[in-house]
């Protein structure tokens, strides 16, 4: 294996390792969000898009070169099989055909996993943000609910005080009671708004989960199509034999 293909194979193994780490169930998206928020990522963010596109271009070039090599040695393979003047040419061509097919798979999967890795990081970041917003809205709803209960308890206390005191303080207590009722209504309105926002955040999280499931299905479909293409290529090689 030449130096360039050894580097591509190492890059492929690194991609597989990162994808497996991202898919670990016991690491929450919020933890990944904290890792992605490090200052070092902000410093290299300006070069990230350029590096991403550069790697894609390099992998596409290597993939097309591997396709060219496969087609080249597949055609030569048929010619040298019928020739008896060079008995070692057939084995030599078979070896080169095997290497070109190996390089084709390495470059193809490296390109595919590179795109999957970019999409996976984006989905993890979006999911972490939605979960954070959900937690904030839930905390606000709980605080509003506690405040509403507190005002209701104070209202009950004022009612008991009104019964125990004489009619002289009745007007003042009624005014305070009315004010507390108004505050209670305001808090209920805020609680309703917060509950609606929390429901919206939950719907957004469900949409993110559905989008992640669709991406997983598309990934499985691509692997299935790649296996079918590989089987067809192997059957074509067997027919040439």
Curated annotation (Swiss-Prot):
Family label: Belongs to the BCAP29/BCAP31 family.
For side Cytoplasmic, which residue ranges?
28-43, 125-241
Which Gene3D superfamilies does the record cross-reference, listed alphabetically? 1.20.5.110
Which InterPro entries does the UniProt record give? Answer: BAP29/BAP31, BAP29/BAP31_N, Bap31/Bap29_C
Keywords, alphabetical: Apoptosis, Coiled coil, Endoplasmic reticulum, ER-Golgi transport, Membrane, Protein transport, Transmembrane, Transmembrane helix, Transport
Q: Where is the composition biased (Basic and acidic residues)?
A: 206-223
Q: What does this protein do?
A: May play a role in anterograde transport of membrane proteins from the endoplasmic reticulum to the Golgi. May be involved in CASP8-mediated apoptosis.
- Please verify whether the record's keywords include Acyltransferase: no
* Location within or outside the cell: Endoplasmic reticulum membrane
Q: Name one GO biological process term.
A: intracellular protein transport
Q: Which Pfam families match?
A: Bap31, Bap31_Bap29_C
Q: Which GO terms describe its cellular component?
A: endoplasmic reticulum membrane
Chain positions of motif Di-lysine motif: 238-241
Q: How does it sit in the membrane?
A: Multi-pass membrane protein
Q: Which residues form a coiled coil?
A: 166-233
**Source species:** Pongo abelii
Kindly give the PANTHER family that the UniProt entry links to this protein: B-CELL RECEPTOR-ASSOCIATED PROTEIN 29, BCR-ASSOCIATED PROTEIN, BAP
Any transmembrane segments, and where? 7-27, 44-64, 104-124
Instruction: Give the quaternary structure.
Output: Homodimer and heterodimer with BCAP31. Binds CASP8 as a complex containing BCAP31, BCAP29, BCL2 and/or BCL2L1. Interacts with VAMP3, VAMP1 and membrane IgD immunoglobulins. May interact with ACTG1 and non-muscle myosin II.
Q: Which residues lie on this side of the membrane: Lumenal?
A: 1-6, 65-103
Claim: Transmembrane helix is one of the keywords in the record: yes
| Residues covered by region (Disordered) | 193-223
| Protein's name according to its UniProt entry | B-cell receptor-associated protein 29
């Amino acid at each position: 294996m030449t130096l360039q293909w050894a580097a591509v194979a190492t890059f492929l193994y690194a991609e597989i390792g990162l994808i497996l780490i991202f898919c670990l169930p016991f690491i929450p998206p919020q933890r990944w969000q904290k890792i992605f928020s490090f200052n070092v990522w902000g410093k290299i963010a300006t070069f990230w898009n350029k590096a991403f596109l550069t790697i894609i271009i390099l992998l596409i070039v290597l993939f097309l070169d591997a396709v060219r090599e496969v087609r080249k040695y597949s055609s030569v393979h048929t010619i040298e099989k019928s020739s008896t003047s060079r008995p070692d040419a057939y084995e030599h061509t078979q070896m080169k055909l095997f290497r070109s097919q190996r390089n084709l798979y390495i470059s193809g999967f490296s390109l595919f996993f590179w795109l999957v890795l970019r999409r996976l990081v984006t989905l993890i970041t979006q999911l972490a943000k939605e979960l954070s917003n959900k937690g904030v809205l839930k905390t606000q709803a709980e605080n509003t609910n506690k405040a509403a209960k507190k005002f209701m308890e104070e209202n009950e206390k004022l009612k008991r005080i009104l019964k125990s005191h004489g009619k002289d303080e009745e007007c003042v207590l009624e005014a305070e009671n009315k004010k507390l009722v108004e505050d209670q209504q305001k808090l209920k309105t805020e609680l309703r708004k917060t509950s609606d926002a929390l429901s919206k955040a939950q719907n957004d999280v469900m949409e993110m989960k559905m989008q992640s499931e669709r991406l997983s299905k598309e990934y499985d479909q691509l692997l299935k199509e790649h296996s079918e293409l590989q089987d067809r290529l192997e059957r074509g090689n067997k027919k040439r034999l």
